[in-house]
Amino acid sequence: LNVHIAAEMVTISLDSSGESLHKRGYRTANTEAPINEALAAGMLLLAGWHGQANFFDPMCGSGTLLIEAALIAQNIAPGIFRKGFGFEKWLDFDKDLFEMVYNDDSREREFTHHIYGSDASFYAVQVAQKNIKSAGMQRFIDVKQIRLEEIRFAGVEGAPKTEGAFVMMNPPYGERLAQDKDVLRLYEDMGKTLKFRFTGATAWIISSNEEAMKCIGLKPAEKMHLLNGELDCLFNKYELFQGEHKDWKKTHPRSEQRTKDKEQRTKRFGDKKREFRPRRDDDKRGFKTREKKDFAPRREKRDFKPKSNYKRPRNNESYTDSRL
């Protein structure tokens, strides 16, 4: 029971949740500064993830993104692993009804693809594996210890398919790294790995370090602003392809629609790239100039100068005195 008093207003409420709902209940171990479970799920939904392809997280940490991706892919309720809720202690709590709802898995779906995670830290991989086991997702998630620059997927025989896959990363933001150069170099390696090892995939990266995000070297297809705790973060989308961006745009499924949109904009607003040249004397205009018309002469201006030596009286002078 919560009571909140503000001036003459008193609010009485019942806590139906108990522990914060962002705590799913599957975490048995943590790495340093793991991402919030609710934020991870929100990022996946914003990216359009519903289990329609393979999923990769090359910096998986404690495995939060991997587990949330598996839950969404199978449409499993996020609070299924919680030990309890606050409303279970209410006097009118219906235990039978709650058990019926809790055990209802009729809306869950089959996940036919796979989820892959990796991290350079052996400890992080161990933590991720424990959490994955706690969530019962070992069948759908594989985690290995491997450095970012050593990842090999695209073009490797027998490797997981990256075409149409989702890649999502929550890299270090720079607060815990010793030097700024280390951060910039890390983000440069991320860009190279995404470009050459995840060809055909769509990548999403969240970070509060805008300067480091520029070092990725890829043009964002989309940008969003999210809050990770108190940090204002960029959440960028990258379309990964071979060759140059202009060539990829021509073969992209939306290229025809983009061409139509451009034609409509040009038709409506004109071509901003059209050439302008100075007008010459011999140029002929395609319109008639305005004909000159004879207008009546303007009336003479009024002359406000005094026509006599008449002056207004000042101070204690009278009208008679002022005329003298």
Outline where the language-model segments fall.
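Non-catalytic substrate-recognition/targeting regions of SAM-dependent transferases
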Residues: L1-Y26
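Conserved beta-strand/loop positions that form the S-adenosyl-L-methionine
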Residues: V3, P58, S62, P171
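Class I SAM-dependent methyltransferase Rossmann-like catalytic core
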Residues: G25-I35
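Conserved S-adenosyl-L-methionine
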Residues: I35-F153, D182
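C-terminal catalytic and target-recognition region of SAM-dependent MTase-like enzymes
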Residues: I146-R258, F269, K273
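Basic Arg/Gly/Lys-rich low-complexity intrinsically disordered segments
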Residues: E157-K161, F196, E230, K237-L324
